[in-house]
């Protein structure tokens, strides 16, 4: 069950990544910022935490590089306030 949830989160994150990468094809920085902002605004904290945990554990091999970059670059924004 956990694998299915992880795969679904990766699929959704990649869809977001594809959209924002197409919006800013020559500006990866803008795309990663937009991806992170979208995840922060529209994903529940539990979803963001799970995606980051799976990413840290190496369980997201199908994650698009632009999404992985967004997770690395904007990690502190994606985590809920303590």
Predicted regions, residues:
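A domain-level signal for the structural core that forms small-molecule/cofactor-binding pockets
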Residues: 1-82
């Amino acid at each position: 069950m956990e694998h299915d949830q992880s795969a679904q989160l990766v699929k959704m994150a990649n869809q977001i990544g594809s959209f924002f990468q197409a919006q800013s094809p020559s500006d990866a920085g803008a795309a990663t910022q937009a991806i992170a902002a979208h995840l922060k605004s529209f994903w529940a904290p539990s979803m963001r935490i799970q995606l980051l945990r799976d990413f840290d554990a190496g369980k997201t091999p199908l994650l698009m590089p632009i999404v992985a970059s967004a997770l690395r670059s904007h990690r502190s924004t994606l985590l809920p306030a303590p």
